[in-house]
Amino acid sequence: MKKEIASHLLEIGAVFLQPNDPFTWSSGMKSPIYCDNRLTLSYPKVRQAIAAGLEELIKEHFPTVEVIAGTATAGIAHAAWVSDRMDLPMCYVRSKAKGHGKGNQIEGKAEKGQKVVVVEDLISTGGSAITCVEALREAGCEVLGIVSIFTYELEAGKEKLEAANVASYSLSDYSALTEVAAEKGMIGQAETKKLQEWRKDPANEAWITA
């Protein structure tokens, strides 16, 4: 599953690997990878594979789920497809409450005591997913965990998720992606080394000259 999804993401250009010409993230950090899972929306076969995979993860790890919650905005579509496949209620969670109307942060119904699984497109440092989890907990929901399409497998993300006491499972990850990219001849040994060094310590730009 991990390599299959990784292959899909590479084929449609949802993930770019540029170890020799790094991207600059909004945080200012240099990165050899850029992920835009919104592109999956434009490819029916890919999004169907993702929905089926997320459903499988949820049934395996969170079988008592009662509500599917998407993170705004990237997780909303995938949450909708998964909830439809599972015939479950769905809601989505904003990064913060609206400044108008009812001032809702949670749109749709997620009632006190209900068991909820969060659907996220990408786990980087885990910030947006944890914001979603906290909002649901404040509403009295029991958050069973998070499922996502892809994770960078960053230590900072793992630590934040552990600190928030929330389980998280991804369809694919950085390790599988770099392995598939190497198998496809998209990166060579030197590029693979840079990618491995970046993941060990993203804040240390020494990987650029590795």
UniProtKB/Swiss-Prot annotation:
Pfam families assigned: Pribosyltran
EC top class, as a word: transferase
The enzyme's E.C. designation: 2.4.2.10
Entry binding sites for orotate: S124
Known cofactor(s): Mg(2+)
Record-level GO BP terms: 'de novo' UMP biosynthetic process; pyrimidine nucleobase biosynthetic process
Residues reported in the UniProt entry to bind 5-phospho-alpha-D-ribose 1-diphosphate: R94, K98, H100, E120, D121, L122, I123, S124, T125, G126, G127, S128
Gene Ontology MF: a single term: magnesium ion binding
InterPro entries to which the protein is assigned, alphabetical: OPRT, Or_phspho_trans_dom, PRibTrfase_dom, PRTase-like
Catalytic activity: orotidine 5'-phosphate + diphosphate = orotate + 5-phospho-alpha-D-ribose 1-diphosphate
S-S bonds: none
Pathway recorded for this protein: Pyrimidine metabolism; UMP biosynthesis via de novo pathway; UMP from orotate: step 1/2
SUPFAM superfamilies: PRTase-like (SSF53271)
Keyword hit for Transit peptide: no
Subunit structure: Homodimer.
Function noted in UniProt: Catalyzes the transfer of a ribosyl phosphate group from 5-phosphoribose 1-diphosphate to orotate, leading to the formation of orotidine monophosphate (OMP).
Family: Belongs to the purine/pyrimidine phosphoribosyltransferase family. PyrE subfamily.
Protein name: Orotate phosphoribosyltransferase
